[in-house]
Amino acid sequence: MNTSQQQQQQQQQQQQQQQQQQQTPQQVENVSAFPPPPPFYKLYLNYKKDVDYSKPTTENSKKNDTPEGNESTIEKNIDNSDEMNIDNNNNNNNNNNNNNNNNNNNNNNNNNNNNNNNNNNNNNNNKATTSTNKKIELNKPLAPPLPPKVGANYVQFGQTYSTVDMLPSLDESGAKQLYPKGDIEPISELKKLNRSILFNYLQLLETLIENPKNYQSKIEDISLLFINFHHLLNSYRPHQARETLLSIMNEQIKQKNQSNESIKKALDICKESLMNSFKNLNIEDKQIDSATPLPTNITSPTKNLMSPTKLNNSQDVNMNENNDDDEDKEINWMDQLLDEMLKIN
């Protein structure tokens, strides 16, 4: 029983110690970046203020009484001082070397950081330029494909086409030609094919009523008729295009003739209105001239005195000459205007 109790007590003590260790914070050693201090600090550890080092102790006095003891102590002190100086110098050199090494390491780290930053910047710039180039390339429209060469074939919507617009014959397409070959009248042949299509359609209705199983042959006949009908229409396309072009040109000629006639009518109306306006202007000028008084010369009344009959005659002559000149000018102006308008037309 005693042994079991002792074991339990020991276990309890161990648990308490573990709990205390967990509760107590772990002591972290102070790690400094500076080098360790020199060993001369050990001199100050044994320093005591109460002790008077000026007075010699009993042991030292006993030793110092003999000349051999004095010499030995002096030599020991000298050796200790030399050793201390050597240690101090070595420590100082080590400290300086450590500082230099630390500075060199710091400079190297700074240079490496700068190089890394420059490399990162260059990489970022390269990425930015590549991204911009990609965006520019995406924004650019796609270049159209090159056109096929003359005589070559190309595929469009799953079908092959030729660059030369040639209508293949029915034999080349694998169908039977029902209308005759050579020079034919396409209109009459189209009418025949249309009638045959209607006749075969009626026969198809009869077969569906009497024998519904035998409808396949009539459907094949109708499909062959439609193929021939479409082929003949396609061969007639150039003639149709020529006729449509002729009709369009005839309509344009009619429209131009109508526009010319309307312009001529407008010119005649303008001529009449201009002539009427000029006539009205001449009448107004004559009325103004008749209302003006006769001129008199005050300086030489004897020389310029004339009979009223002579004055009236001279005024009439002058008026007639002026009117003739005005009419000639009006006629010339009208002729020029008409000539210019005709040139424009």
From Swiss-Prot:
Gene3D superfamilies: 6.10.140.200. It comes from the Eukaryota. One of its GO terms (biological process) is negative regulation of transcription by RNA polymerase II. Residues 1-130, 292-315 are annotated as: Disordered. One of its GO terms (molecular function) is transcription coregulator activity. GO terms for cellular component: core mediator complex; mediator complex. The keyword Chaperone does not apply. Pfam families: Med7. Transmembrane segments: none annotated. It is found in: Nucleus. Keywords: Activator, Nucleus, Transcription, Transcription regulation. Belongs to the Mediator complex subunit 7 family. Component of the Mediator complex, a coactivator involved in the regulated transcription of nearly all RNA polymerase II-dependent genes. Mediator functions as a bridge to convey information from gene-specific regulatory proteins to the basal RNA polymerase II transcription machinery. Mediator is recruited to promoters by direct interactions with regulatory proteins and serves as a scaffold for the assembly of a functional preinitiation complex with RNA polymerase II and the general transcription factors. Component of the Mediator complex. This is Putative mediator of RNA polymerase II transcription subunit 7. It comes from Dictyostelium discoideum (Social amoeba).
